[in-house]
Amino acid sequence: FIKKEKRKEDPYKNIAIEDPKQLALFWQCSEELSPRFPFKAELHQFMLLTAMRKTECLKMEKAHINFEKGTLFIPKGISKTKYRDEELPITPELEVLLRNILDLGNRPDFPFYKMKDFRWLFATRNWGAQKYFNKDFRLSHKARLGGDEKYIPVLRALMREKSGDPDLLYAPKILRKTYITKSQQIFAGRSEITQQMSRHRNIDVLNSHYNKPGIETRREYASEVSKVFSFIQRRTA
């Protein structure tokens, strides 16, 4: 008989950022690290404001943004459930972030980002002059951001330093949980409202099959939650 070792419990399994000051700290540190980790810092910010999964965010395209309609399109092909095409409302805070992301194309090291046929919202850092006119590369999955593994410990360390808490826990997986937790608190546990932004398919049969609010109703829901992120500001040149 071989006794199996107990699996270590994931320290981030039941964690969400509930303290408004810690939320603001996360945003401040992300802004501070953006020049060093462009697109990676914004990826984490985007995850917080949309409650989207990282794998979904990395596949988002600039064309999925419709400022005129105020919607963010999520094709079923990139959704985890792959159930149907979905839309999220663009709140004022999310619009600020999206415009900040698009403004990364103004940086001298990312001239390719504004090219009409460069489709990815989060671009690769692995870019060279030889790839500038390589259309196949620009249109391929290789041109989008691959991951954030090196960024996570740097952001965590900066948050710990600024908070004075050496045990502060941070991982990107808590961002979706944070949005959902905040939504549940604001809407007094009404899961059918939270579900419209978290895009969970199965909370219960009633909510899945009969609760179908339109985009404007969901915009009201999302705007209420988004007021929590009042610290977000447009970047200056």
Placement of each model-derived feature along the sequence:
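C-terminal catalytic core of tyrosine-transesterase DNA break-rejoin enzymes
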Residues: 45, 49, 55-56, 174-201
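Basic, Lys/Arg- and aromatic-enriched nucleic-acid-binding interface segment
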Residues: 1-54, 58
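C-terminal secondary-structure termini that scaffold catalytic or DNA-interacting sites
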Residues: 69, 103-108, 115-118, 204-205, ...
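Short, polar N-cap/turn motifs at the start of nucleic acid-interacting alpha helices
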Residues: 64-71, 168-169, 188-209, 234
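Catalytic-site neighborhood detector that most strongly recognizes the C-terminal catalytic loop/helix
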Residues: 78-80, 198-224
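Phosphate-coordinating loops and pocket residues in cytosolic domains that bind phosphorylated ligands
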Residues: 28, 59, 67, 208-212
